[in-house]
């Protein structure tokens, strides 16, 4: 067992409580209404709610979307921090998983596509976390439009790879768990898109609920990599580097003597 097992656990343990803290701060500061509220008004002329308690009058501007919760300070500061740190962890997890699959099996388009999807998901998270929806709506929506589908694609491909690499009953059970999480993510994301284009109060509130389910589901999925990361070693990254070096040496146009000598030198350096 290696220390890398802490990374996926840390992502889940840091991000899930973090976004709930952001939500609680937004509710207490009257920036959004609580998720259990299902009553909305067209306008709120006078809200006599006491400080430190949830709003008593809510409009569509107060729907507790995750992005809305992180729009205004002070919660926006924590929201950006969670987005940036979480994105960095996601990239490291994707790189390690990519290298681990190469070490166990061989290079495949599924593995490469999963790496690209995971890194794209991280890039979208950075945009979502740093461009608040009320101040940079276009950039925020671009980030969300990139992060959510890329995250779904990553979990889909990772679930397939889990079955391809399964060698024990526990591996297959983990694959079943990941497929279940993937199905939940797919359903919640599709419903988010369907409800988002509706203008009714009920539909917009359902958007918030589906969005929360999707994000929490994806974070739990990333946490499941703790199972495989117990076997990550220094040889894991080397396997990816050696595979890349071997591929470049075998590429067309690399048959010259100087290129072959360079490739041989790289192989010797990796030993």
From Swiss-Prot:
Record-annotated membrane-spanning stretches: 4-24, 76-96, 109-129, 141-161, 183-203, 206-226
One GO CC term, this protein: plasma membrane
Extracellular topological intervals: 25-75, 130-140, 204-205
Subcellular location: Cell membrane
Cytoplasmic compartment segments: 1-3, 97-108, 162-182, 227-271
Glycosylation sites: 37, 41
Function summary: Regulates localization of phosphatidylinositol 4-kinase (PI4K) to the plasma membrane.
Protein name, as recorded: Transmembrane protein 150A
Organism: Xenopus laevis (African clawed frog)
């Amino acid at each position: 067992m290696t220390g890398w097992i802490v990374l996926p656990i840390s992502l889940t343990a840091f991000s899930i409580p973090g976004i709930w803290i952001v939500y609680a701060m937004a509710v207490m500061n009257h920036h959004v209404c609580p998720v259990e509220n299902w009553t909305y008004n067209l306008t709120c002329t006078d809200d006599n709610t006491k400080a430190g308690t949830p709003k008593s009058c809510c409009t569509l501007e107060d729907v507790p979307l995750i992005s809305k919760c992180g729009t205004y300070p002070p919660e926006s500061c924590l929201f950006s921090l969670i987005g940036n740190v979480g994105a960095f962890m996601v990239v490291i997890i994707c790189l390690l998983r990519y290298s681990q699959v190469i070490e166990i099996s061989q290079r495949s388009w599924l593995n490469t596509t999963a790496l690209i999807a995971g890194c794209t998901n991280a890039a979208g998270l950075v945009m979502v976390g740093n461009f608040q929806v009320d101040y940079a709506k276009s950039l925020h929506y671009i980030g969300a439009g990139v992060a959510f589908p890329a995250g779904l694609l990553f979990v889909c491909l990772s679930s397939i790879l889990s079955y391809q690499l399964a060698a024990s009953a526990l591996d297959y059970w983990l694959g079943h768990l990941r497929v279940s999480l993937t199905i939940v993510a797919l359903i919640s994301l599709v419903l988010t898109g369907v409800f988002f284009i509706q203008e009714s109060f009920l539909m917009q509130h359902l958007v918030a609920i589906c969005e929360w389910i999707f994000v929490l589901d994806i974070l739990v999925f990333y946490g499941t990599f703790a199972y495989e990361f117990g076997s990550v070693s220094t040889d894991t990254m080397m396997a990816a580097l050696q595979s890349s070096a071997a591929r470049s040496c075998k590429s067309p146009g690399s048959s010259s003597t100087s290129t072959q000598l360079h490739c041989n030198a790289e192989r010797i350096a990796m030993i």
